């Protein structure tokens, strides 16, 4: 009877069988990882569309340190249809590939003071999958599925549900991110007064974003003139201006379109005009050139290592990839990009005013060497946008917020500008993928935006200044961006270690002296009683001599007791290389996490160009 009832329940409730716990997503090892303790991470698929076999893949890293608050940063790449593994392994993640087999640490990783969550979306992107007849078409469809993903992710990892949440990304993610933010705010309104927790969405970061097609399409020629790519007034320029006038007319009649073919022709023609010796301009980094059939699609060069690494069988297994997905990882999915062509969803620029007026902080940043999502277009969309009682960066009618010079480790890094919850950062000498070129500067920008305060944990600050002023929150903590600060930390650790060794040696020497004196006293008494005494170093005693015991302590034969050390000095020791396994005060070990999760489970029974 009992077995029949159990079988019936399992049949009626397949979720009892299929429900996963966090332990099922734990990454036990990562091929090619640097020596030492592995960073704490989870990865795998979460189902978001059961009817169409829709699953989103995520890769999550726990923060290495906690400053003044718990934070989670969600990172999305663009496309549409380009994998966020670009961000994980080439931009803001803790690892970079030295070759297709070896990982190295990224000095500017964003996981220093925030949990990092990379998501391949929409379905069909990267390691995510769905039935081939069920790719998404609209931005509101995408955001709805992302909410389903987050609901399940927070069920699996409830310890992060109260974190300050930031959503970051680049390029076509400039469409995704505002839509997801709006969906989160609507979800929070719907759960008010219920026992369900609201999500503490604090800010958005969009780099070289495809946000406003009107301004971005119309920025191609002005940017090309500004950078000397095309000579203004030339025959070539006039030919391109004809195409741009057609684009402008289409924009006026199709204001709610995210993508327009007539405007894409401007970029295609511009790239064709730059061909020399079978090489054309790299549209993602104008300092570089590429083959005429690619014009930047072969960039970054790290892709040569990322693709074979993510297609390795041992890596796929380590990341808990569904073995039924046999297509293998590709950076950008043409099928997803072709299907995702919003006709009903207005461009995300129309959502920004409402998000800013709700109190949400938004940061738009632009690498100055990107053509396809260049800073001229971003600056123009800001100038034209109205929010919070003003237009653009107005502080009062006719008065604009000043631009502040940003320097990093003594070198000009860019400019900052802020008004009414919106921050703009122009970053010098950076491409379409700012963190790829300048990881440490990008981390400094993130820490400023999140108001990271490391005063409670110490560490040496990065030399980062706004108009020459260094603010406390620009420090980068125990895993410093500054090379000089890192060397100082190593010297401090070495000095503290030597002090500890010296103290332990002094303590042992004192024990030896006391032992010798006591032994001598007994020998003296023995000689007085027995005249046949043979001496201290008799061969029968050689195996347990005090000197050998002392030698054993020096060579690790036995540990010096804790009382021999100054515990305060030892507690102060910290190095990212030596203590990378420590993440938070009072945190349980990975094994404890897994066993607890098993216990809890038992108790509960884009277009023609990729905007990557």
From Swiss-Prot:
Spans within the Lumenal topological domain: 20-503
Cytoplasmic side: 525-612
Acidic residues bias spans: 561-570
Family listed: Belongs to the peptidase S10 family.
Main location: Golgi
Catalyzed chemical reaction(s): Preferential release of a C-terminal arginine or lysine residue
Keywords: Apoptosis, Carboxypeptidase, Glycoprotein, Golgi apparatus, Hydrolase, Membrane, Protease, Signal, Transmembrane, Transmembrane helix
Assigned EC number: 3.4.16.6
Stretches with biased composition (Polar residues): 472-485, 597-612
SUPFAM superfamilies: alpha/beta-Hydrolases
Molecular function as annotated in GO: serine-type carboxypeptidase activity
Protein's name in the database: Pheromone-processing carboxypeptidase kex1
Sugar-bearing residue positions: 100, 421, 429, 481
Localization terms from the record: Golgi apparatus, trans-Golgi network membrane
Entry's Gene Ontology BP terms: apoptotic process; proteolysis
Active site: 171, 370, 432
Topology of the protein relative to the lipid bilayer: Single-pass type I membrane protein
Transmembrane domains' residue ranges: 504-524
Task performed by this protein: Protease with a carboxypeptidase B-like function involved in the C-terminal processing of the lysine and arginine residues from protein precursors. Promotes cell fusion and is involved in the programmed cell death.
Signal peptide: 1-19
Organism: Aspergillus niger (strain ATCC MYA-4892 / CBS 513.88 / FGSC A1513)
Region (Disordered): 460-489, 557-612
GO CC, one annotated term: membrane
Top-rank lineage group of the source organism: Eukaryota
One protein family per Pfam: Peptidase_S10
């Amino acid at each position: 009877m009992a077995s029949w009832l159990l079988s019936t329940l399992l049949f009626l409730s397949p979720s009892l069988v299929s429900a996963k716990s966090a332990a099922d997503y734990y990454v036990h090892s990562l091929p090619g990882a640097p020596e030492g303790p592995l960073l704490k991470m989870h990865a795998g698929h979460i189902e978001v569309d059961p009817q169409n076999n829709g699953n989103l893949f995520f890769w999550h890293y726990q923060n290495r340190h906690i400053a003044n608050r718990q934070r989670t940063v969600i990172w999305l790449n663009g496309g549409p249809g380009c994998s966020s593994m670009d961000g994980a392994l080439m931009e803001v993640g803790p690892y970079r590939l030295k070759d297709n087999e070896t990982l190295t640490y990224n000095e500017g990783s964003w996981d220093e003071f925030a949990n990092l969550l990379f998501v391949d979306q929409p379905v069909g992107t990267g390691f995510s999958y769905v039935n081939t007849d069920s790719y998404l078409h609209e931005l509101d469809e995408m955001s709805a599925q992302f909410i389903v993903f987050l609901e399940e992710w927070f069920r699996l990892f409830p310890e992060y549900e109260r974190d300050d949440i930031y959503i970051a990304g680049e390029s076509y993610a400039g469409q995704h991110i505002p839509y997801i933010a709006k969906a989160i705010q609507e979800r929070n309104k719907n759960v008010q007064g219920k026992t369900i927790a609201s999500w503490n969405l604090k800010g958005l970061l969009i780099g070289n974003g495809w946000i406003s097609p009107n301004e971005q399409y119309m920025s191609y020629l002005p940017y090309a003139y500004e950078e000397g790519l095309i000579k203004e007034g030339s025959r070539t320029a006039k030919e391109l201006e004809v195409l741009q006038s057609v684009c402008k007319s289409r924009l006026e009649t199709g204001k709610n379109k995210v993508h327009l073919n007539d405007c894409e022709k401007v970029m295609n023609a511009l790239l064709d005009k730059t061909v020399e010796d079978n090489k054309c301009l790299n549209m993602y980094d104008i300092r570089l050139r590429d083959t005429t059939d690619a014009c930047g699609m072969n960039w970054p060069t790290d892709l040569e290592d990322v693709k074979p690494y993510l297609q390795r069988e041992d890596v796929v297994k380590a990341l808990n990839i569904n073995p039924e997905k046999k297509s293998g990882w590709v950076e950008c999915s043409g099928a997803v990009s072709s299907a995702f062509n919003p006709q009903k969803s207005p461009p995300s620029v129309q959502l920004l005013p409402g998000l800013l007026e709700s109190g949400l902080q938004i940061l738009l940043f632009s690498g100055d060497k990107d053509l396809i999502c260049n800073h001229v277009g971003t600056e123009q969309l800001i100038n034209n946008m109205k929010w919070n009682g003003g237009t653009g960066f107005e502080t009062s009618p006719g008065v604009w917020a000043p631009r502040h010079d940003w320097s990093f480790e003594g070198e000009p890094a860019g400019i900052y500008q802020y008004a009414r919850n919106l921050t703009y950062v122009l970053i010098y000498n950076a491409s379409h993928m700012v963190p790829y070129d300048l990881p440490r500067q990008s981390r400094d920008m993130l820490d400023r935006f999140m108001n990271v305060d490391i005063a409670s944990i110490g560490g040496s600050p990065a030399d980062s200044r706004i108009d020459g002023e260094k603010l406390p929150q620009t420090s980068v903590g125990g895993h410093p961006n500054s090379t000089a600060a890192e060397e100082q930390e190593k010297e401090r650790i070495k000095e503290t270690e030597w002090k500890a060794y010296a103290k332990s040696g002094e303590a042992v020497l004192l024990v030896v002296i006391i032992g010798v004196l006591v032994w001598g006293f007994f020998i003296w008494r023995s000689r007085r009683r027995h005249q046949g005494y043979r001496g201290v170093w008799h061969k029968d005693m050689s195996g347990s001599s005090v000197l050998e015991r002392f030698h054993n302590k020096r060579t690790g034969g036995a540990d010096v007791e804790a009382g021999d050390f100054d515990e305060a000095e030892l507690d102060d020791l910290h190095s990212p290389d030596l203590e990378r396994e420590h993440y938070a005060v009072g945190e349980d070990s990975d094994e404890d996490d897994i066993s607890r999760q098993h216990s809890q489970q038992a108790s509960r029974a884009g277009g023609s160009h990729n905007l990557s």
